[in-house]
Each structure stands twice: as structure tokens, then as C-alpha cells.
């Protein structure tokens, strides 16, 4: 896929069961050296609560480490409690806003990839 998700610095991971797409997550680089972003994590409603989001998060973190990134950032809506708890279990912590975003009620998070 072209654009910011293009390899070698960007990645897209998709989860399938019986050829049905059930989830995915993307990894674009940020301008800051060694920093990437987790974007577009989604799990289809039927498959939520079954570890798909956790598996995709683990895989994208490992992928980012393999590419050589030292930090990963993300943004999420503050109302998405389940997603925020998931990110916290992996070690993400809240940071200041890191890009210009017109949306309100957004939480920004970061993790060191060591």
C-alpha cells in the first residue's frame, strides 16, 4: 500500500479467520527519528473480547521493534476505556499532544520500545 504505510518504514497487519477480515492495525513512521505511530487498530464487533486486539497490539509492537523504532505513539478517544486499558497493559502512558488535531477529548500515549 502506498503512502505513509508503505514498507520498509510502515506496515499494515490484518487478522483473518476463514478468509474473513476480523481486525487490523497500521504502523506509519513519524517525522521524529526512531518514532512510529500505531494507527487504525480495529476489531470487528463479532470478534471483540476474544484477544484479537491484544494480539494485533503485541504484533505491531514487535514489528516496530523489528523495524528499529525506539518509541511508538498513538492517539485514542478518551471515551474508549477498553482500548485505553489495553494500551496501558502493554506499557503505554499518557503524553502531551504530539500533533495538531482539531478533535477534542483525545488521549495521546507513548511507549518505549526496548
Range-by-range predicted roles:
Residues 70-114:
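C-terminal "cap" of GNAT-fold acetyltransferases
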Amino acid at each position: 500500500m502506498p503512502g505513509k504505510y508503505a514498507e520498509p518504514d510502515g506496515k499494515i497487519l490484518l487478522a483473518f479467520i476463514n478468509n474473513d477480515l476480523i481486525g487490523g492495525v497500521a504502523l506509519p513512521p513519524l517525522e521524529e527519528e526512531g518514532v512510529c505511530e500505531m494507527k487504525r487498530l480495529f476489531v470487528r464487533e463479532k470478534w471483540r473480547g476474544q484477544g484479537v486486539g491484544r494480539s494485533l497490539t503485541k504484533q505491531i509492537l514487535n514489528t516496530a521493534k523489528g523495524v528499529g523504532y525506539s518509541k511508538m505513539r498513538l492517539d485514542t478517544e478518551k471515551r474508549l476505556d477498553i482500548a485505553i486499558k489495553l494500551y496501558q497493559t502493554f506499557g503505554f502512558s499518557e503524553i502531551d499532544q504530539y500533533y495538531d488535531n482539531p478533535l477534542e477529548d483525545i488521549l495521546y500515549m507513548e511507549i518505549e520500545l526496548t
